[in-house]
Amino acid sequence: MVNVSVNGFGRIGRLVTRIAISRKDINLVAINDPFISTDYAAYMFKYDSTHGRFDGEVSHDKDHIILNGKKVAVFNEKDPAALPWGKLGVDVAIDSTGIFKEMDSANKHIEAGAKKVVITAPSGSAPMYVMGVNEETYTPDQKIVSNASCTTNCLAPLAKVIHNEFGIKEGLMTTVHSMTATQKTVDGPSHKDWRGGRTASGNIIPSSTGAAKAVGKVLPSLQGKLTGMAFRVPTVDVSVVDLTVNLAKETSYDEIKAALKKASEGSMKGILGYTEDDVVSSDFLGDAHSSIVDAAAGIQLTPTFVKLVSWYDNEFGYSTRVVDLVEHVAKSA
């Protein structure tokens, strides 16, 4: 049994909690969020505008949120170093704040007594792991790891299969990405990203993303071969990757589909999905795969030039991988 804590009870923190309490090998011992009281934590956990009502019992007392009869301690510390992770025997602290995403700041959880930390965001300093792609390279001496981003988790499995089978010489990615909490409900100040300050629900907003370049960190053979951008669109959840690649080996679209379908049923089962149906974004709400290939949407121009399309629930699919990585890190200890 792995003792787990969650720091940051936002979109990802709450979904990670839903998934974690459904796993028999995980014991959720605590949640920390400096801005949320236990009654409000219970309310936000119970009701979700996107993923629906929690299918279980939720209540609270002064110091706990009670999930299906199990008491989970709730803390309101701004500084993770002040949390009682040692006293609670925390094996893995999940940091889903989006703030403590570098080695020095995430190390506050180690100072607090946690044995390991999983960051639910890409990191410039912590090693990044994408389940189904490079988790086998994890070594137990690594105390702090990153689960990369939701988009990297969608793109990397797709790129790995294509690169292994046909070779990727270079590629450009566009993610058409649902709104997230960093965006604005109405036009407002956003000094680092002027476009990002525009009304999320009324615009298609071009944005930068490091997700494609990050694939080179989890798949070194693709270092420098991929880059990309994002369009933020007015949907609440589910996003889609459009990957256009120049291949080293001539092939047909049927051969590409066959390779992806084989991977989805074999080595990447549960990580990479595959469909030939005429689907739309809402069909993937609550899908636990990291990436679901839309075989009917892809196109080929020449034997070496192809566009591939793959969907992902950027909240639920990603949160599922966070919990998978926690289990992997704990088992490797």
Curated annotation (Swiss-Prot):
Where along the chain is NAD(+) bound?
11-12, 33, 78, 314
Intracellular or extracellular location(s): Cytoplasm
* InterPro entries assigned: GlycerAld/Erythrose_P_DH, GlycerAld_3-P_DH_AS, GlycerAld_3-P_DH_cat, GlycerAld_3-P_DH_NAD(P)-bd, Glyceraldehyde-3-P_DH_1, NAD(P)-bd_dom_sf
Q: Which reaction does it catalyse?
A: D-glyceraldehyde 3-phosphate + phosphate + NAD(+) = (2R)-3-phospho-glyceroyl phosphate + NADH + H(+)
Active site residues according to the UniProt entry: 150 (nucleophile)
Classification via Pfam families: Gp_dh_C, Gp_dh_N
What biological-process GO terms show up in the record?
glucose metabolic process; glycolytic process
Listed pathway(s): Carbohydrate degradation; glycolysis; pyruvate from D-glyceraldehyde 3-phosphate: step 1/5
Instruction: Provide this UniProt record's keywords sorted from A to Z.
Output: Cytoplasm, Glycolysis, NAD, Oxidoreductase
Q: Look up keyword Metal-binding and say if it applies.
A: no
* Primary site of residence: cytoplasm
Q: Where are the transmembrane segments?
A: none
Is the keyword Glycoprotein in the record?
no
Site Activates thiol group during catalysis — annotated at: 177
Q: This protein's superkingdom? A: Eukaryota
Concerning its family, UniProt says: Belongs to the glyceraldehyde-3-phosphate dehydrogenase family.
For this entry, the protein name equals Glyceraldehyde-3-phosphate dehydrogenase
| Native organism | Zygosaccharomyces rouxii
